[in-house]
Amino acid sequence: MSPLPADARLQRVRTVRAELHASGPKRRRPFEGDFERVALPEADGDVLRDLLVAHGARTVIEVGLAYGSSALAIGEALCVTGGTDASHIVIDPFQATAYDDVGRDAIVAAGLADRTTFIDEVSSIALARLAHEGFSADAAFVDGSHRFHEVFVDLYFLRKLVRPGGLIVLDDAAWPSVATAVRYFDLNLGWQAVTVGGRLTARRLPDQPLEPSFTDFKPF
């Protein structure tokens, strides 16, 4: 299937995004209120989209697909910034088994499949491999496991993958596990907070990567 023209692709993404938030996903996990609890709300998706556009992101890594709400917001941003070179790496080991590929189907329905790479592995393995391969991204969005050690590992590898001056955005900033993991990188590696609203938090990486001395450590 040939890629859609740029204007038609952007309109399709916006239509699929609007339908997802108006009517819900085609399929849901069997838990009451699951979509509303798990999916990135539309307003926060707009914030994510606008952040990526403002930073000119053309290549984005996403950890956690679920129902696809954040992926569609990222896809909309890439329609604006990326042109034919846009690339979206989506990592989610549970997309097929837990979500019956509903998020993947939303990306396909939006006409974004040709610029999206799906990785069905845990992020600690997938991100490590991408780093080993020398992959580089302009930005990342993190909404996978919220266990502290897993958020920390995601950020550890994304520090190597996102270019200097790039952007890392995380969902559920109010979770203590997420906030604590981010605080380490703020204090020890010079990440700078970017003002956002809602439930997201965003960090800009230093223009010159900071590598602390072997003995330097700031408690977090």
Q: Where are the language model's segments positioned?
A:
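Rossmann-like AdoMet
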Residues: 1-40
